[in-house]
Amino acid sequence: MGLRYSKEVRERHGDKDLEGRVPMTLNLPQGLYGRFNCKSCWFANRGLIACSDHYLCLNCLTRLRSQSQFCGICGKPLPTKIRFEESPSAPPYEP
């Protein structure tokens, strides 16, 4: 669920990764100055999405995207496409 592309996308682009995808990390390593947190709410530290020089949680990213196409913190365009770095904790896919 969410790990496979639809048949139309695979036929159009093949098996290569689509360009413009921003990685979503489920577990970030601890940084030099402590844990990485969402720059908007400062609570979320899992499922962060990289904006230009900071991280946003999915809730804050959705809220910011509903207001504008640009980040209210750094002023750069907000990410629109997400790529998962690690697969979510679910049973392995068996066809």
From Swiss-Prot:
Motif PTAP/PSAP motif, residue range(s) on this chain: 88-91
Matches recorded under Pfam families: zf-P11
Superkingdom field: Viruses
Classification via InterPro entries: RING_finger_Z_arenaviridae (IPR024183), Z_RING-type_Znf_sf (IPR038485), Z_RING_Znf (IPR003224)
A biological process term (GO) from this entry: viral budding from plasma membrane
Zinc finger map (RING-type): 38-74
GO molecular function, one term: zinc ion binding
Lipid-binding residues (covalent, N-myristoyl glycine): G2
Membrane topology (UniProt): Lipid-anchor
Keywords of this entry: Host cell membrane, Host cytoplasm, Host membrane, Host-virus interaction, Lipoprotein, Membrane, Metal-binding, Myristate, Viral budding, Viral budding via the host ESCRT complexes, Viral release from host cell, Virion, Zinc, Zinc-finger
PTM annotation, UniProt: Myristoylation is required for the role of RING finger protein Z in assembly and budding.
Domain writeup: Late-budding domains (L domains) are short sequence motifs essential for viral particle budding. They recruit proteins of the host ESCRT machinery (Endosomal Sorting Complex Required for Transport) or ESCRT-associated proteins.
Self-association and partners: Interacts with protein NP; this interaction probably directs the encapsidated genome to budding sites. Interacts (via RING domain) with polymerase L; this interaction inhibits viral transcription and replication, Z partially blocks the product exit tunnel for the releasing nascent RNA product. Interacts with the glycoprotein complex; this interaction plays a role in virion budding. Interacts with host eIF4E; this interaction results in eIF4E reduced affinity for its substrate, the 5'-m7 G cap structure.
Family as reported in the entry's similarity comment: Belongs to the arenaviridae Z protein family.
Protein name: RING finger protein Z
Organism, as annotated: Pirital mammarenavirus (isolate Rat/Venezuela/VAV-488/1995)
